Design a protein with these regions (language model features):
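Radical SAM enzyme [4Fe-4S]-AdoMet core and its adjacent flexible, acidic
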Residues: 1-54, 60
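Radical SAM enzyme core and accessory elements
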Residues: 63-139
C-alpha cells in the first residue's frame, strides 16, 4: 500500500511503487502483471513462477484509480468520508442520534457516495484538505 501524504505520512519519505517493483524484480526477475482480481478492491497483482502467491499493489498516489474507487470510510465519530484526500464527510452520527429513518440514512449514504471526487489531490500539497492522521480517520 503506497504511503498517502496525510497525517504523519506528510513528513515521511515516500518510495514509489515502481521503485519497489524494480527491487522485487531483482529477486524474482519473471515477476509480471496478472489480470487476476481478488474481491472488489483496488489492488493490482503480479505473479512469478518462483512464488506460491501473488504480490499486490495499491498505489493510489502514483497511479490514480479514483474513477474506479469503490471505497468510503466510516470514522469512529460517525463521519462517512468518501475520499481520504479531502476533509469532506457526511455526519451520520448526528443523523442517527437524531432519530432518522432508514430511508433518510440511505439517502445520506447515496448523496455522499454519489459526490465522491473523481480524482484525489495528493499530487498538490496545497489542495489536500484532510489534516487528520490515518489512525484518526480509521486507517
Amino acid at each position: 500500500i503506497e504511503l498517502m501524504p496525510i497525517g504523519f505520512g506528510t513528513a515521511m519519505r515516500r518510495v514509489s511503487p515502481d521503485d519497489i517493483l524494480s527491487a522485487l524484480r531483482e529477486r524474482w526477475p519473471d515477476l509480471a502483471p496478472t489480470d487476476e482480481r481478488r474481491g472488489n478492491g483496488p489492488a493490482h497483482y503480479y505473479k512469478s513462477d518462483l512464488l506460491l502467491g501473488r504480490i499486490g499493489f495499491i498505489d493510489a498516489v502514483s497511479h490514480k484509480f479514483c474513477a474506479d474507487c469503490n471505497r468510503v470510510r466510516l470514522t469512529s465519530t460517525g463521519q462517512l468520508k468518501p475520499c481520504l484526500c479531502y476533509a469532506d464527510s457526511a455526519d451520520l452520527r448526528t443523523l442517527i442520534r437524531g432519530g432518522c429513518t432508514d430511508d433518510e440514512l440511505r439517502e445520506a449514504l447515496k448523496i455522499s457516495i454519489y459526490n465522491k471526487p473523481r480524482a484525489h489531490c495528493f499530487d498538490t500539497d496545497a489542495a489536500v484538505t484532510e489534516r487528520h492522521a490515518m489512525s484518526q480517520i480509521g486507517g
